[in-house]
């Protein structure tokens, strides 16, 4: 049993003086517990974040006591009966940068240790890198769970999570101070329409850091139990969910878990389980019986409720069978149909008919949602008929053509992973004739007259894909090469998605942070 204790050893750096490069300790205690009226001048430090500036600001806030009006500050806060501005944006950006530097390397190294093999880390950055993985793995699995990461989470829980990383007391005094005075303190992630501008706009860096810290925390616990599920068959699951001294319990798991427990959660060994997270949601795909899948479902619910104090109802997690369910993922509709093939086998004078079920991942382009997205951005009407873009009519011909070409090529590049590319021709048709109508509107002409005047066959050829150009240049080429261009092509250079795909995610119902 001692070999498990080495694995369960806490792999987290305990930073003692995380804020020492930025602040004087006396200033932190003064900020957190002092109720004196100390103010600073409103100096234009926008977009000029540096460690030296933050350190000087903290010193001024502690020493200067004169009252000064802030003419350029529209979001004034009241403290002790006066209006003041602590330049919270600069300070939070400053220690956000410091915390990122300290955490990023540690998290990167720990994530690489958790991987069995990392051959090409840069290739994993592409959005398309997940689809070849699905092609190889999903056909052998039978259940999929859609997990919506719950929020809001109380800010005090985040502070407690940071306590197990950092022992610098002044850091927690400062972060509690800002949370209390510059946020609503009830939740870090309020509803969409009520997102606090303090976190979402002015301090996006610290907002993203805290959110990623929260997600990383619950995923680290899940992965730990997943990797050691076969060795933890008789361990009580509530041992892991208690907030106080969780990591100490995890370190000494062997001694603690031997005690008698009233309820026992039996973990199971299953190598066919995969977890993918994206855009505030996650997917758990596995091959198990419905009973064991429901155990994983309630594990997540208990984890959020007992560990993070977040109420997550059963509707947070949906379980579906892959063979009977198609789901939307990163702009594609994915399904695993079962194709039945009949093979005749003959042995001497006897012949047999053997039925073989072949599973294959289908990546379908969601044409109707894409057309709705184009209609909202005024490339076509609700019926799918192309219309001109009057907003672009004042630009040059080269600019208009370049904008349409980039949109069309980005679409073709992103959806080249679909084996049924003919369904995408309607989208290309809308973009082509929307471009022509925009140019005709600019030159105050009809579409027919504009095409005759400029002989715009060349204009339309610019919108052809690689497969179309290949068939035009080499009309008598071999069938093998044509099949190559008709097949799926996943690119490893797609790091971002265009706005239309993001809008498509919103229409389907996926929350984007």
UniProtKB/Swiss-Prot annotation:
Family recorded in the similarity comment? Belongs to the intron maturase 2 family. MatK subfamily.
Q: Recorded GO terms, molecular function?
A: RNA binding
The organism of origin for this protein? Phaseolus vulgaris (Kidney bean)
Q: What is this protein called?
A: Maturase K
One GO CC annotation: chloroplast
Q: Name one GO biological process term.
A: RNA splicing
Going by the entry's taxonomy, the superkingdom of the source organism is recorded as: Eukaryota
HAMAP family named in the record: MatK
What this chain does, per the record?
Answer: Usually encoded in the trnK tRNA gene intron. Probably assists in splicing its own and other chloroplast group II introns.
Give a yes or no for keyword Chloroplast in this entry: yes
What are the protein's UniProt keywords?
Chloroplast, mRNA processing, Plastid, RNA-binding, tRNA processing
The subcellular localization recorded is: Plastid, Chloroplast
Upper lineage is: Eukaryota, Viridiplantae, Streptophyta, Embryophyta, Tracheophyta
């Amino acid at each position: 049993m001692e070999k498990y204790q080495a694995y369960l050893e806490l792999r987290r750096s305990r930073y003692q003086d995380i804020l020492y490069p930025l602040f004087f300790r006396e200033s932190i205690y003064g900020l957190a517990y002092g109720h004196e009226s100390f103010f600073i001048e409103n100096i234009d430090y926008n977009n000029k974040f540096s460690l030296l500036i933050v350190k000087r600001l903290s010193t001024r806030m502690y020493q200067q006591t004169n009252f000064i009006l802030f003419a350029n500050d529209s979001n004034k806060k009241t403290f002790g009966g006066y209006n003041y501005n602590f330049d919270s944006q600069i300070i939070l950006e400053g220690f956000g940068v410091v915390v990122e530097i300290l955490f990023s390397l540690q998290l990167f190294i720990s994530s690489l240790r958790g991987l069995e093999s990392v051959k090409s880390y840069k290739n994993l950055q592409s959005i398309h890198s997940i689809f070849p993985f699905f092609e190889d793995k999903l056909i052998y699995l039978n259940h999929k769970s859609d997990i919506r990461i719950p929020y809001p989470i109380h800010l005090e829980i985040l502070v407690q999570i940071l306590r197990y990383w950092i022992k610098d007391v002044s850091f927690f005094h400062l972060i509690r101070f800002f949370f209390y005075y510059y946020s609503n303190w009830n939740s870090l992630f309020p509803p969409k329409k009520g997102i606090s501008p303090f976190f979402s706009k002015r301090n996006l860096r610290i907002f993203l850091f805290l959110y990623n810290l929260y997600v990383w925390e619950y995923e680290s616990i899940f992965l730990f139990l997943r990797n050691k599920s076969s060795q933890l068959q008789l361990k009580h699951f509530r041992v892991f969910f208690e907030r106080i001294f969780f990591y100490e319990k995890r370190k000494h798991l062997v001694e603690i878990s031997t005690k008698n427990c009233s309820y026992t959660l039996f973990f199971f060994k299953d190598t066919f389980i995969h977890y993918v997270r994206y855009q505030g949601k996650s997917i758990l795909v596995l091959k198990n019986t419905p009973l064991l899948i429901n155990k994983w479902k309630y594990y997540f619910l208990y984890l959020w409720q007992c560990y993070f104090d977040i109420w997550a109802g059963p509707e947070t997690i949906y379980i579906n069978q892959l063979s009977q369910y198609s789901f939307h993922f990163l702009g594609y509709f994915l399904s695993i149909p079962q194709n039945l093939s009949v093979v005749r086998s003959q042995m001497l004078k006897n012949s047999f008919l053997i039925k073989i079920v072949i599973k294959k991942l289908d990546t379908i382009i969601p044409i109707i949602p894409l057309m709705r997205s184009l209609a909202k951005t005024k490339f076509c009407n609700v019926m799918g008929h192309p219309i001109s873009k009057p907003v672009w009519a004042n630009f040059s011909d080269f600019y208009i053509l370049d904008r349409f070409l980039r949109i069309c090529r980005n679409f073709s590049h992103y959806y080249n992973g679909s084996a049924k590319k003919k369904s995408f021709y309607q989208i290309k048709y809308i973009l082509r004739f929307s471009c022509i109508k925009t140019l005709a509107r600019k030159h105050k002409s009809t579409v027919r007259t504009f095409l005759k005047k400029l002989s715009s066959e060349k204009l339309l050829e610019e919108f052809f894909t690689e497969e179309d150009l290949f068939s035009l240049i080499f009309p008598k080429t071999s069938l093998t090469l044509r099949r190559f261009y008709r097949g799926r092509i996943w690119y490893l250079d797609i790091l971002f998605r265009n706005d239309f795909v993001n809008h498509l995610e919103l229409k389907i119902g996926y929350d984007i942070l």
